[in-house]
Amino acid sequence: MVTVRPRRVRVVCWASAVTLLVVFSLVATSLTGATGDGYGSFQRGDQLAMVGLGVFGALGFLLFTRPRVVADARGVRVRNVIGSYELPWEVIRGVRFDRGAPWASLELHDDDLLPMVALQAADKERAVEAVRALRRLHQAHLAAMADAATPR
Protein backbone atom coordinates (compact mmCIF):
# COMPACT_ATOMS: atom_id res chain seq x y z
CA MET A 1 0.00 0.00 0.00
CA VAL A 2 1.22 3.47 -0.90
CA THR A 3 -0.08 6.60 0.85
CA VAL A 4 1.20 10.02 -0.20
CA ARG A 5 0.45 13.55 0.94
CA PRO A 6 2.36 16.66 -0.10
CA ARG A 7 4.79 17.78 2.59
CA ARG A 8 6.09 21.20 1.60
CA VAL A 9 2.70 22.60 0.59
CA ARG A 10 1.13 21.47 3.87
CA VAL A 11 3.77 23.32 5.90
CA VAL A 12 3.34 26.50 3.84
CA CYS A 13 -0.46 26.33 4.01
CA TRP A 14 -0.58 25.81 7.77
CA ALA A 15 1.89 28.66 8.36
CA SER A 16 -0.08 30.93 6.01
CA ALA A 17 -3.40 30.04 7.64
CA VAL A 18 -2.11 30.79 11.13
CA THR A 19 -0.49 34.05 9.97
CA LEU A 20 -3.66 35.17 8.21
CA LEU A 21 -5.80 34.42 11.25
CA VAL A 22 -3.42 36.32 13.56
CA VAL A 23 -3.29 39.34 11.22
CA PHE A 24 -7.07 39.51 10.88
CA SER A 25 -7.46 39.14 14.65
CA LEU A 26 -4.98 41.98 15.27
CA VAL A 27 -6.76 44.19 12.75
CA ALA A 28 -10.09 43.35 14.40
CA THR A 29 -8.83 44.39 17.83
CA SER A 30 -7.56 47.69 16.44
CA LEU A 31 -10.93 48.53 14.85
CA THR A 32 -12.50 50.65 17.57
CA GLY A 33 -14.12 54.04 17.74
CA ALA A 34 -14.89 56.53 15.00
CA THR A 35 -13.98 56.03 11.35
CA GLY A 36 -12.44 59.47 10.95
CA ASP A 37 -14.48 62.40 9.67
CA GLY A 38 -17.49 60.19 8.88
CA TYR A 39 -20.50 59.36 10.98
CA GLY A 40 -19.76 55.66 11.35
CA SER A 41 -17.94 53.89 14.11
CA PHE A 42 -16.57 50.39 14.45
CA GLN A 43 -18.64 48.17 16.70
CA ARG A 44 -18.21 44.69 18.16
CA GLY A 45 -19.94 43.18 15.09
CA ASP A 46 -17.30 44.71 12.80
CA GLN A 47 -14.56 43.14 14.88
CA LEU A 48 -16.24 39.74 14.82
CA ALA A 49 -16.71 40.04 11.05
CA MET A 50 -12.97 40.65 10.60
CA VAL A 51 -12.13 37.59 12.69
CA GLY A 52 -14.70 35.62 10.67
CA LEU A 53 -13.05 36.72 7.42
CA GLY A 54 -9.72 35.56 8.82
CA VAL A 55 -11.22 32.17 9.69
CA PHE A 56 -12.67 31.75 6.19
CA GLY A 57 -9.38 32.80 4.61
CA ALA A 58 -7.46 30.33 6.78
CA LEU A 59 -9.89 27.55 5.84
CA GLY A 60 -9.31 28.45 2.18
CA PHE A 61 -5.57 27.99 2.67
CA LEU A 62 -6.15 24.68 4.45
CA LEU A 63 -8.08 23.32 1.46
CA PHE A 64 -4.70 22.93 -0.22
CA THR A 65 -3.64 20.45 2.47
CA ARG A 66 -6.42 18.08 1.35
CA PRO A 67 -4.69 16.20 -1.54
CA ARG A 68 -3.82 12.56 -0.93
CA VAL A 69 -3.11 9.45 -2.99
CA VAL A 70 -3.71 5.97 -1.60
CA ALA A 71 -2.91 2.96 -3.77
CA ASP A 72 -3.06 -0.76 -3.18
CA ALA A 73 -3.34 -3.93 -5.26
CA ARG A 74 -6.95 -3.10 -6.23
CA GLY A 75 -6.47 0.46 -7.48
CA VAL A 76 -5.79 4.10 -6.70
CA ARG A 77 -7.77 6.63 -4.68
CA VAL A 78 -6.90 10.21 -5.59
CA ARG A 79 -8.15 13.15 -3.53
CA ASN A 80 -7.30 16.55 -4.96
CA VAL A 81 -8.14 20.04 -3.66
CA ILE A 82 -11.64 19.69 -5.10
CA GLY A 83 -12.85 16.25 -6.11
CA SER A 84 -11.99 12.65 -5.37
CA TYR A 85 -11.56 9.64 -7.63
CA GLU A 86 -11.34 5.92 -7.02
CA LEU A 87 -9.94 4.03 -9.98
CA PRO A 88 -9.18 0.34 -10.46
CA TRP A 89 -5.84 -0.47 -12.07
CA GLU A 90 -7.70 -1.77 -15.16
CA VAL A 91 -8.51 1.78 -16.34
CA ILE A 92 -4.98 3.12 -15.79
CA ARG A 93 -2.47 3.01 -18.63
CA GLY A 94 0.44 4.50 -16.70
CA VAL A 95 1.79 6.88 -14.07
CA ARG A 96 3.37 10.04 -15.50
CA PHE A 97 5.62 12.63 -13.94
CA ASP A 98 6.79 14.72 -16.88
CA ARG A 99 9.83 16.95 -16.65
CA GLY A 100 8.74 20.43 -15.61
CA ALA A 101 5.28 19.28 -14.50
CA PRO A 102 4.12 20.62 -11.12
CA TRP A 103 2.66 17.22 -10.13
CA ALA A 104 2.31 13.65 -11.31
CA SER A 105 -0.72 12.33 -13.16
CA LEU A 106 -2.41 9.09 -14.04
CA GLU A 107 -2.76 8.33 -17.74
CA LEU A 108 -6.06 6.55 -18.34
CA HIS A 109 -6.94 4.18 -21.18
CA ASP A 110 -9.48 6.69 -22.54
CA ASP A 111 -6.58 9.16 -23.08
CA ASP A 112 -7.54 11.32 -20.10
CA LEU A 113 -4.99 12.54 -17.60
CA LEU A 114 -5.93 12.66 -13.92
CA PRO A 115 -3.66 15.02 -11.96
CA MET A 116 -2.42 13.82 -8.58
CA VAL A 117 -1.79 17.06 -6.71
CA ALA A 118 -0.45 15.09 -3.74
CA LEU A 119 2.65 14.14 -5.76
CA GLN A 120 4.26 17.54 -6.23
CA ALA A 121 7.60 18.38 -7.79
CA ALA A 122 8.30 20.62 -4.78
CA ASP A 123 8.66 17.47 -2.65
CA LYS A 124 11.54 16.35 -4.90
CA GLU A 125 12.91 12.88 -4.11
CA ARG A 126 9.95 12.00 -1.91
CA ALA A 127 7.59 12.51 -4.86
CA VAL A 128 9.85 10.53 -7.19
CA GLU A 129 9.89 7.59 -4.77
CA ALA A 130 6.10 7.70 -4.52
CA VAL A 131 5.77 7.65 -8.32
CA ARG A 132 8.13 4.67 -8.47
CA ALA A 133 6.04 2.86 -5.84
CA LEU A 134 2.86 3.54 -7.84
CA ARG A 135 4.54 2.24 -10.99
CA ARG A 136 5.59 -0.94 -9.16
CA LEU A 137 1.99 -1.52 -8.05
CA HIS A 138 0.77 -0.92 -11.59
CA GLN A 139 3.35 -3.32 -13.04
CA ALA A 140 2.40 -5.95 -10.46
CA HIS A 141 -1.23 -5.61 -11.51
CA LEU A 142 -0.31 -5.91 -15.20
CA ALA A 143 1.75 -9.04 -14.45
CA ALA A 144 -1.14 -10.57 -12.51
CA MET A 145 -3.51 -9.83 -15.41
CA ALA A 146 -1.07 -11.43 -17.88
CA ASP A 147 -0.77 -14.54 -15.67
CA ALA A 148 -4.55 -14.79 -15.43
CA ALA A 149 -4.91 -14.49 -19.21
CA THR A 150 -2.34 -17.22 -19.92
CA PRO A 151 -4.08 -20.57 -20.58
CA ARG A 152 -2.96 -23.45 -18.41
Question: For each predicted feature, which ranges?
Answer:
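Hydrophobic alpha-helical transmembrane segments
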Residues: 40-52
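Surface-exposed loop/turn and secondary-structure junction residues enriched for glycine/proline
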Residues: 7, 12, 34, 45, ...
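Single-pass alpha-helical transmembrane signal-anchor segments
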Residues: 16-26, 49-63
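Acidic, Ser/Thr-rich low-complexity segments on the non-lumenal side of membrane proteins
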Residues: 70, 85-121
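Short hydrophobic/aromatic-rich motifs at helix boundaries and adjacent loops
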Residues: 29-30, 45-48, 74-77, 103-107
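A membrane-cytosol interface segment of integral membrane proteins
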Residues: 107-152
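N-terminal membrane-targeting/pre-transmembrane regions
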Residues: 1-42
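Conserved beta-hairpin
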Residues: 53-88
